[in-house]
């Protein structure tokens, strides 16, 4: 196991490019590539100790190099003194496609890093070589040979103990699922209940992007005003699980053309939001509407509260939390903005203060924006950092 010693590590260090060890890399064989990855892993974190730097980094593999997998890598790359070291990616599309889609992104723009393929089984990111493997069955992945500590499970497929457990069978020590987990898998939302993280758990979930938006400001509402019951609608950008044109899908609504329709679908956010408000356990409902935008979504929450209040007081509670315990997680916006303005927002949710309403004195309506890819991926990195900093 990696021996980690961490001091004074924050979760909001998103600025700047991550410094990576790098060595000259020419044409290599597969064995040479493994040696390079092993070499880089051994020297990262070496030398004199610095404040906020771990002595040994957690070896991380990304399973599924889609929207969240690539966003995660970009977010991690932008962190200073990360306790994580991404050394492997499992992607079925091949090295050329993986490197191209990492470098050029229709939503995020061009990645400010030198990205290129390395032979047929690696990509280089600013000189750091990451091995790329390809197998749809996690049991067959070389996690044991690579000494993988943590797998970022980003396929959306292996979300129960049996599926995610295949990574552990393959030799990984722990798994972090970037989707709602099924069954009894522990779910953690940074800023809400991540302080309760149990390092003895080998498999955990980072919940959904909508839960990560909703839970922080629901926590504030419940603590300040007492939530009785509520309902939530998320107007959500379409995702890769929908169809570009009408085509077969197990969900008949998602079978319809994503760019032409408003598509009602399902979400586990109502269940997961009980993490931040016991009052909402079994007394809340949620409806997602997928709309023809590629990124950024917005939550519309209406709750009945026990303490009489007014809009300015509600916004004041959000501002206080955003400046203190939820700094870097929650934000408040006073400008008349639209969805694209929240693209690449680092926070989990941004309350639109001008749209906060109180009906009577006990029914509160809150609108909050979130980048359902980038903001969520920042929280995946945060939770992975927590796993690293409490490694056992």
UniProtKB/Swiss-Prot annotation:
Residue stretches in coiled coil: none
Superkingdom of the source species: Eukaryota
GO biological process: glucose metabolic process; reductive pentose-phosphate cycle
PROSITE patterns per the UniProt record, alphabetical: GAPDH
Main location: plastid
Pfam families xref list: Gp_dh_C, Gp_dh_N
Site (described: Activates thiol group during catalysis): 236
Catalytic activity: D-glyceraldehyde 3-phosphate + phosphate + NADP(+) = (2R)-3-phospho-glyceroyl phosphate + NADPH + H(+)
InterPro entries per record: GlycerAld/Erythrose_P_DH (IPR020831), GlycerAld_3-P_DH_AS (IPR020830), GlycerAld_3-P_DH_cat (IPR020829), GlycerAld_3-P_DH_NAD(P)-bd (IPR020828), Glyceraldehyde-3-P_DH_1 (IPR006424), NAD(P)-bd_dom_sf (IPR036291)
Positions bound to NADP(+): 67-68, 91, 136, 372
Entry keyword set: Calvin cycle, Chloroplast, NADP, Oxidoreductase, Plastid, Transit peptide
A Gene Ontology cellular-component term: chloroplast
Residues annotated as the enzyme's active site: 209
SUPFAM superfamilies cross-referenced by the UniProt entry: Glyceraldehyde-3-phosphate dehydrogenase-like, C-terminal domain, NAD(P)-binding Rossmann-fold domains
EC top class named in words: oxidoreductase
Transit peptide: 1-56
GO molecular-function terms, A-Z: glyceraldehyde-3-phosphate dehydrogenase (NAD+) (phosphorylating) activity; glyceraldehyde-3-phosphate dehydrogenase (NADP+) (phosphorylating) activity; NAD binding; NADP binding
Biological or metabolic pathway of the protein: Carbohydrate biosynthesis; Calvin cycle
Annotated EC: 1.2.1.13
Subcellular compartments: Plastid, Chloroplast
Residues binding D-glyceraldehyde 3-phosphate: 208-210, 239, 254, 267-268, 290
Protein family: Belongs to the glyceraldehyde-3-phosphate dehydrogenase family.
Note: Plants contain two types of GAPDH: cytosolic forms which participate in glycolysis and chloroplast forms which participate in photosynthesis. All the forms are encoded by distinct genes.
Subunit structure: Tetramer of either four A chains (GAPDH 2) or two A and two B chains (GAPDH 1).
NCBIfam families assigned to the protein according to its UniProt record, in alphabetical order: GAPDH-I
Protein name stated in the entry: Glyceraldehyde-3-phosphate dehydrogenase A, chloroplastic
